[in-house]
């Protein structure tokens, strides 16, 4: 049986670094909620069986009317960390017929620059891989190490062979669930899915990502994301 594809969008964060009273995934960019662009990219990939959005149980900002016409489901099962939200979402996917052998693509809600083309490139590259992998970019900037709380450079780090992880991150549902459970049992709260897979002893692959697929994190990121999205909307 051919493994099916599922998308999981953890959307339970508060976006405290963005400087906004409203969680950043609901901020309006180029006329739409930031989250809308992520959902629209996966909606355009009809090969996906389901896209599941994981919200915080007490999320009062989500309004389904802002995403009318897009195909997705919502579960209010977000946890206290990204790792917990993803794990809870993986467990909920069983309700939609997902099996351990099926693929899940976990994507940050705050990466509105994702495109159907990049999603399909990732799937095409990894669909026969025994582990899975992520989209990422080779590090282009010079890296400086600065002690915590300080402002003086301790040393320059080599950027050779370093890649900056992005999302989506694509793994078998069962493998990812067990990897996160193992990390959780051993007291680790990991910041992406590939870290859990690595912790379990597997070797994920990297697929070339895109500069436009950056994560909206700081206040100045919104203007850049809006310019990119407005240009894409006008071009279409």
UniProtKB/Swiss-Prot annotation:
The EC number(s) attached to this protein equal: 2.7.7.60
Q: Which reaction does it catalyse?
A: 2-C-methyl-D-erythritol 4-phosphate + CTP + H(+) = 4-CDP-2-C-methyl-D-erythritol + diphosphate
Q: Pathway, according to UniProt?
A: Isoprenoid biosynthesis; isopentenyl diphosphate biosynthesis via DXP pathway; isopentenyl diphosphate from 1-deoxy-D-xylulose 5-phosphate: step 2/6
The record's annotation in InterPro entries points to: IspD (IPR001228), IspD/TarI (IPR034683), IspD/TarI_cytidylyltransf_bact (IPR050088), ISPD_synthase_CS (IPR018294), Nucleotide-diphossugar_trans (IPR029044)
Q: Where is this site: Positions MEP for the nucleophilic attack?
A: 159, 215
Q: Which Gene3D superfamilies match?
A: Spore Coat Polysaccharide Biosynthesis Protein SpsA, Chain A
Keywords for this protein = Isoprene biosynthesis, Nucleotidyltransferase, Transferase
Q: Per the record, where is site Transition state stabilizer?
A: 17, 24
Gene Ontology process terms (BP): isopentenyl diphosphate biosynthetic process, methylerythritol 4-phosphate pathway
Q: Where are the transmembrane segments?
A: none
The molecular function GO annotations come to: 2-C-methyl-D-erythritol 4-phosphate cytidylyltransferase activity
Q: Which family does it belong to?
A: Belongs to the IspD/TarI cytidylyltransferase family. IspD subfamily.
Q: What does this protein do?
A: Catalyzes the formation of 4-diphosphocytidyl-2-C-methyl-D-erythritol from CTP and 2-C-methyl-D-erythritol 4-phosphate (MEP).
Instruction: Please report the name of this protein according to its UniProt entry.
Output: 2-C-methyl-D-erythritol 4-phosphate cytidylyltransferase
Give the species this sequence originates from: Burkholderia lata (strain ATCC 17760 / DSM 23089 / LMG 22485 / NCIMB 9086 / R18194 / 383)
């Amino acid at each position: 049986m051919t493994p099916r594809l599922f998308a999981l969008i953890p959307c339970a964060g508060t976006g405290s670094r963005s400087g906004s009273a409203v969680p950043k995934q609901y901020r309006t960019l180029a006329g739409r909620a930031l989250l809308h662009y992520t959902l629209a990219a996966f909606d355009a990939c009809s090969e996906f069986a389901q896209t599941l959005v994981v919200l915080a149980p007490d999320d009062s900002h989500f309004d389904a009317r802002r995403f009318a016409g897009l195909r997705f489901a919502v579960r209010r099962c977000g946890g206290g960390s990204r790792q917990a939200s993803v794990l809870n979402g993986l467990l909920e996917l069983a309700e939609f017929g997902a099996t351990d052998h099926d693929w899940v693509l976990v994507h940050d809600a705050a990466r509105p620059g994702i495109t159907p083309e990049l999603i399909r490139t990732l799937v095409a590259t990894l669909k026969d891989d025994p582990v899975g992998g992520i989209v990422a970019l080779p590090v282009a900037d010079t890296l400086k190490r600065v002690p915590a709380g300080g402002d003086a450079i301790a040393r320059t780090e080599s950027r050779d062979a370093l890649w900056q992880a992005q999302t989506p991150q694509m793994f078998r549902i069962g493998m990812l669930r067990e990897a996160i459970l193992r990390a959780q049992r051993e007291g680790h709260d990991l910041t992406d899915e590939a870290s859990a897979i690595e912790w379990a002893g597997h070797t994920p692959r990297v697929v070339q990502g895109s500069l436009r697929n950056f994560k909206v994190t700081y206040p100045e990121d919104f203007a850049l994301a809006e310019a990119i999205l407005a240009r894409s909307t006008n071009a279409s």
